[in-house]
Amino acid sequence: MPAYSEFEFQNGLLYDYVDNQFPTRLFAWEGQQDFRSDNSTYFGYVFEGEVEVETADNDYRLKARQYFSFNHPIRLRGGRGIVIERIGFRGFNLCGGPVENWGRLKYIDGCTDSLLVPPVKLGDPCLNALFFPENIDQTAHTHPSMRVGMVIEGSGQCVTPERNYDLEPGKIFIIHEDGNHKFRTSSNDKLTVIAYHPDSDFGPVDENHPMINRTIVEGVSAAQIEEIRTK
């Protein structure tokens, strides 16, 4: 399998990773699209326009540069963007944004990133924004699971052993598991990418999270008192 695949912006299913250990489907929508599974979480990003997200419990109106996560069926009306379906996972329901202009976390080679939808627990999927300043020639690297991306601003290249791919706003792509790649920007252009990860090695666990760590019993964190922790 090549390191990288890219897709034209068209309504509907773009790529089916259902047989992966982290089963995932990639969609684009333009105008209207229904997502009906009640056994999935839908991560989405609004690329252009304004979209109404209809759910069984509530309706939401989102604009360009906003993002969402829903763990039940949704209907999208208006605008256009991408939806990544993580099959068999129940995430949180949330909306956020607009995406900022720079990341809150330092990454590699001068790049930064932000967790837009963080893992609720260790191992969960997450949605990120990745920011490349001008004149970046990133260190070549791989990832142990797929990365589903969309260019939301600026321009650059994804460099792979097979070829170099031009990146511009609206480009949708997948970097496949263990695919060797790096990103480049010119001296005149920044680049911002939305990136979905189907798993993580980061996040809270039952024995280590802010609520239990900062609950103090006679000077000792409840995280260290096994007999009172919820079983």
Indicate residue ranges for each PLM-predicted region:
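A short glycine-rich, His/Asp/Glu-containing loop-to-beta-strand
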Residues: 2-42, 102-137
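A mid-sequence, solvent-exposed acidic-amphipathic segment
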Residues: 127-145, 149-154, 158-162
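Short, low-complexity cationic-aromatic patches
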Residues: 32-45, 72-78, 118-122, 136-146, ...
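Activation on folded, globular domain regions of eukaryotic proteins
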Residues: 114-115, 138, 150, 156-157, ...
